[in-house]
Amino acid sequence: MIIKCKMCGGDIDFIPGATYGTCEYCGSTSTIPQAEDENKLNRYNRANHFRRQCEFDKAVAAYEKILEQDDTDAEAHWGAVISRFGIEYVEDPATHQRIPTCHRVQVASILTDEDYLAAVENAPDEESRRIYQEEAARIAEIQKGILAISANEKPYDVFICYKETDENGQRTRDSQWAQDVYYGLTEQGLKVFFSRITLEDKLGQQYEPYIFAALNSAKVMVVIGSRPEYFNAVWVKNEWSRYLSLMKHDHKRLLIPCYRDMDPYDLPEELSMLQSQDMSKIGFMQDLRAGFRR
C-alpha cells in the first residue's frame, strides 16, 4: 500500500504497523493513517490530494466522510483541521524543509479546534501525539502573526472576487472588468478590496492577513466571472466560499454574482440562488450600487 506525504505528495517510507513515517522525496516525518485496507487508504490519499491542491472545502468533506465511519480516527481529524485552516506546505528555499502556510486563518486558535483536540486525544501513541502537538503549535504561531497584521487593517466596504490570470498566465477580461467596478465603487467613496491593486506591494505568502481582514470586514462581496470554470477556479472559490460561511452568521452581509458572456444557469450551485447581475446590460453599475442598498 502507498501512503502519500501530507507535505509534498511523495511516497511515505514506513514500516507496516507504524504510526508515522518519512517521505522519500522531501524528508518530512509525519503521522500516517491507520488504514486496514487499500480502499480506506485511497480515501485518505484523495482527501490529502484535495488539500494539497488547495481545494480545502473538498478536503474537509472527504475527511468528514472518513470520520462518519470512525469518529475516533486521529489522522482524519488532523486532516480535517489542517484543511479547515487552509494549510499548504511550501518548500523553504534556504533549508529545503516544508513549512506550513495558512490560507484560511480562523479567529479561534487551532489549539482549541475540536478536530485538533480529537486528533490528540485519539492519537495511537505518544510519538503521533507529539507530532500533532508540535505541528499545531507551529501553525498557531503563524495564525497569531496573521491576526496581528490583519488587526491593523482598516475595514473594507466591498470585496471584489475574480480570476486574475488565464491558463496561459495572461490577464483575464474578468480582471479588466473587475478593475472597472473597483474604480466605479471607489469613486462613490467606498473602500474596496481588489487584489490587483490592494495586494500589489505585498509578497505572495503575506496575502492571507489582508484577505482575511477584508473578507471579515466587507459587508458586500462582488464575484465577477465570464466562464463557469473561472467562478470555480480554486482561489476564486476559496474566497467566495469563505464569504458564504461568514454570511451564515451575519445576515446583513451580501454577495452579488456578476456574470458576462455566459448563461447564469452555469453559475456554481452555491451562487445560483443569489440575485445576480449581467455585466453586459446597460446600467449595470447603477443596478449594482442599487443592490448594495437592498
Regions found by a protein language model. Give the residues of each.
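Short cysteine-rich clusters marking metal-coordination/redox-active sites
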Residues: 5-8, 23-26
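Cys/His-rich microdomains that often coordinate metals
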Residues: 9-12, 30
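Short Cys/His-rich micro-motifs in 6-15 aa windows
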Residues: 27-36
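Alpha-helical segment of the N-proximal tetratricopeptide repeat
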Residues: 38-65
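Residue-level recognition of tetratricopeptide repeat
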Residues: 56, 72-74
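Short coil/linker segments at helix-helix boundaries
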Residues: 86-135
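Conserved N-terminal substructure of TIR/SEFIR domains
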Residues: 137-224, 244-254, 261, 282-294
